[in-house]
Amino acid sequence: DSQNEPGDKTCPKCHQLNVTGSTFCPNCGAKMEGSGNASVDAASDIVSGIANKINSVTGGEGPVELRMRDLFSEVFKKHTREEVENIFACGSEKTTPKLEDISREWPKPWYFARVFGFLLISSLLLYFMFVTFNNQIVIPGLIFVSSMIGAIPILFFYFEINSPRNIDLMTVIQIFFFGGLLSLVITLTLFQVFPTDASPIATLVAAAIEEIGKIVATSWYIQKLQNKRFLFNGLLIGGAVGAGFDVFESAGYTFYALLGNNFTAQEFLTSAIGRGLTGIAAHVAWGAITGAGVMMVLKKNREFSWSLLWTGESLRFLILTTVLHTFWNTPILPNLLQQGILILLAL
C-alpha cells in the first residue's frame, strides 16, 4: 500500500486523493472534512442558504460553504503590473502547475472588477461622444462595448478562479467567439424546427432551446480539450460559450432599440448599458452552470459520450438553467426585483 503524506486527504464526495492539502478538493471542488472554517458575513449566509437549496435539488450532498468575504477581498486593493501578468501566464506547458502544485488557497480574483470598470467607462465615453457631438460613427462601438459590460467581467472571474491554470486566454477568446456563434447556430436551427409564440409554454420551450444550444457547444469544446477535466474547467468553458451568446444577443437587441420608431438617446443608453449589465447573471452564468454539470458527469464516466449530456448532474443543471431562464423571460415581479433575485441565484 502507498503511504500518504500527512497533509493528504480523501475527498468525502468524489473520493479522490487531495494531494495538495487544499481546503477544497481540486478534483470536484467539495470542501474537505476537517478544514478550518473562516467567518463569513450575513450576505454569505444568505447566498449559501440559497446555494444549499439548489445543491440539494440538483443532487448534491452536504452544505455549500461560500466564503464571499475572502473571495472578493482583493478587489479594492492596489495591484502591480507583475500581478496582472501572472494572472495571464497560464495554460502552456511551462506555466500550467502540476497537480500537487495547484494553489491551496481559496481563489481571490480581482482583475475582473478592473475589466468591469474599463468596459463601463468606455461605454459611457462612447455615449458621451454620441450625445455631445451627435456623432453616429461611435454607435457600433457603443453597441458592442456596452453589450460586454456584464458578461465579460464574469468570464474573467471564471478565468481567475480556474485554479488548475490549464486554460490560456487565447483558448478562452476562441471559445467566446466560435463557441458563442456555434451555440447561436444550434439555437436558431432548433427554432426552425420548434417555432415558438408568446404563450407560457413557448417561453419555456424557447429557454430550453437556448440552453440546449449552449450545452451542446460547451460539450463540443469539452470533448475537444481532452486534458481539461477539472470542475473549474467546465465553469470556464461553459462561461465562455455563454458570454459569447450573451454579447451577440445583447448587441442584437440594442440594435433593435436603435431602429425603433420612437428612439431617443436616453432609450438607447438604457437599452445598451442596461442590457449589458444584466449579462452579469444571464447566459454567462447559465453556461457555466451547465458546463460544470457536464464536467461532473464526465468525472464519473471518464470517457466522453454525447449521451452523458442527458444524465446525472448534467441533466439536472440543464433543467435548472432552463427554469432560471424561463423565469428571466417571464415578468412575474417588478423588473429590477426579479432580475436581482436571479442575479443572486446565478452567482
What are these regions (language model features)?
Residues 8, 22:
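Residues immediately within or flanking Cys/His clusters that coordinate Zn2+
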Residues 1-4, 25:
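N-terminal acidic, proline/glycine-rich, low-complexity intrinsically disordered segments
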